A protein has these predicted regions:
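Histidine-centered metal-chelating micro-motifs
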Residues: 45-46, 65, 81, 85-90
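Short, conserved beta-strand element in jelly-roll/cupin
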Residues: 39-41, 50-66
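Ligand-binding loop in jelly-roll beta-barrel domains
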Residues: 85-109
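A cytosolic small-molecule/anion-sensing beta-strand core signal
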Residues: 60-61, 76-77, 95
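Short strand-coil-strand connectors
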Residues: 67-71, 94
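Conserved short histidine dyad/triad with adjacent acidic residue
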Residues: 19, 34-50
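Short acidic-glycine-tyrosine-enriched beta hairpin
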Residues: 70-85
């Protein structure tokens, strides 16, 4: 996908295998915002990390234990959370599913 392209057709874009039962697909983005789909197999881990981007995560399907700055929440389909810049966060998948992550500004480190 090219930056500022208006339509992202999911079926035309491959997944990036991150290992450990996690794969990612960068969807629509420009310099200000990026949408990323992340698929988790049962018991897969979203490694604890931090970054300077603002992040909002939406649970499209599945159930996750999601930790932000030392507080752990159980999130399921339809739930969302806000991750402030530089907050330490990560997750554990307790029912296979998909997270939709929205970042501002875009994550240049996710581009090929």
């Amino acid at each position: 996908m090219k930056p500022d392209q208006l339509l992202f057709e999911d079926s035309k874009h491959p997944w990036e295998d991150l290992g450990g039962g996690v794969r990612r697909k960068v969807m629509s983005y420009n310099a200000d915002v990026m949408v990323v789909k992340v698929q988790f197999e049962l018991h897969a881990i979203g490694t604890i990390h931090q970054h300077p981007h603002t992040q909002v995560t939406y649970v499209a399907s599945g159930v996750f234990e999601y930790t932000v700055d030392g507080r752990t929440y159980t999130m399921q389909s339809g739930d969302s959370c806000y991750v402030p810049p530089n907050a330490v966060h990560g997750c554990r998948c307790i029912a296979a599913g998909v997270l939709i992550d929205i970042f501002s500004p875009m994550r240049e480190d996710f581009l090929p």
